[in-house]
Amino acid sequence: MRGPKLQFEHPTQAAASAFLLAAADGDASAMWIALSRETRGLLEGLYAARAGVSLRAAAGVEGGGADARVAEVTAPLRASILAALGAERLGGYGVANARLVARGVAYVLLLPDFGEERVVSQDEWKPSHLLAFVHESREWLLDLAKTAALSAEAGLPDPLGGIRR
């Protein structure tokens, strides 16, 4: 079995950085538009269960800032990220090169306490988490299920796995 293909400049790197910054800033709209359709559906379902509303009423959350529900829907995801990565350290993670696992599936490794942009030596290379993306609608979007599966496969903790009802 072949390992993932390494890509040095890939849209998932910028997407991961933007998503982490949005989570740190509490920008629910930016977080929402960065998520895959499947992940959005999962969060809408969780929102429906928590709010006691029908799935039909919870579906179709818009991320453009006009939908008041987006902050409530993304709150469990943001809480999970802050708990796993640390609110005070969230802006300090480095994002490694993308790894292409399959057509339309890629992930990036997060390096804690990275500091300034630089090339990392073998001794410094200690990834703590990964974020997985799927390519849909011509964009690379963060995917909850792929992040969980690839994190488990890599023996890394799932930064999005702390979501609870």
Q: Across the structure, where does each feature detected by a protein language model lie?
A:
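Short, low-complexity N-terminal intrinsically disordered segments enriched in polar/charged residues
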Residues: 1-33, 37-49
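Polar low-complexity intrinsically disordered regions
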Residues: 1-5, 31, 63, 133, ...
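Low-complexity, intrinsically disordered terminal/linker segments enriched in charged
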Residues: 99-165
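Generic low-complexity, intrinsically disordered sequence content enriched
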Residues: 24, 39, 47-50, 59, ...
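Surface-exposed, charged secondary-structure patches
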Residues: 2-8, 43-122
